């Protein structure tokens, strides 16, 4: 580790990391949510792709910062599309961000407790764990679905602190 990072981390007992966009490349999720799902919705409803995108955007705005937004079961029901199956079909796109794996390897050799804290749905987390060795680097994994609040809600953090 470089000296500045090492100095900061030497003062750290526990390091909480997010998964998507922090450790794993967000392009996997972006591809699914911004391209594949709107295409599937347009095809299923026989509507223009722009209408499918508008429909999704309306619901994104309505559900933003809620657990519904992160729940693939909710989206599957709303869209009448198997969202988990789409995630599985695109699994070859799951990858670490550049430098993330080497950072995790380095930090796992330290005395710092590393935990994953994510808004991910359990099923998509399990898929990502299966496709990577990500689970090897974390002592604990906490999901917002387990606490019934998204990370954006202060109650999530209260529940997490109580559990810790």
Report each predicted region and the residues it spans.
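Short, flexible, glycine/charge-rich loop motifs used to bind or transfer phosphoryl groups or to couple energy/partner
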Residues: 2-7, 104, 130-132, 160-162
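Substrate-recognition "cap/lid" segment bordering the active-site pocket of phosphatases
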Residues: 115, 121-164
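Catalytic-core regions built around general acid/base machinery
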Residues: 99-111
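Conserved functional loop/turn residues at catalytic and ligand-binding sites
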Residues: 16, 23, 111, 133, ...
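N-terminal helical cap/lid subdomain that shapes the substrate entry/recognition surface
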Residues: 5-102, 121-123
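Glycine-rich phosphate-binding loop signature in dinucleotide/nucleotide-binding domains
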Residues: 8-10, 109-112, 163-164
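Residues within well-ordered alpha helices
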Residues: 40-41, 75, 106, 128, ...
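Secondary-structure boundary motif
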Residues: 43, 106-109, 134, 162
């Amino acid at each position: 580790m470089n000296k500045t990072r090492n100095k900061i981390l030497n003062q750290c007992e526990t390091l909480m990391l997010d998964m998507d966009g922090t450790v794993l490349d967000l392009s996997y999720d972006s591809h699914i949510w911004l391209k594949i799902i709107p295409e599937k919705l347009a095809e299923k409803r026989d509507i223009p792709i722009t209408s499918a995108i508008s429909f999704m955007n309306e619901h994104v705005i309505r559900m933003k910062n809620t657990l519904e937004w992160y729940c693939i079961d909710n989206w599957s029901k709303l869209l009448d599309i198997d969202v988990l199956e789409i995630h599985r079909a695109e699994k070859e796109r799951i990858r670490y961000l550049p430098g993330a794996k080497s950072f995790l390897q380095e930090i796992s050799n330290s005395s710092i407790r590393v935990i994953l804290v994510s808004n991910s749905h359990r099923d998509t987390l399990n898929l990502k764990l299966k496709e990577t060795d990500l689970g090897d680097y974390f002592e604990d994994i906490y999901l917002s679905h387990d606490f019934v609040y998204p990370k954006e809600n202060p109650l999530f953090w209260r529940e997490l602190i109580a559990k810790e």
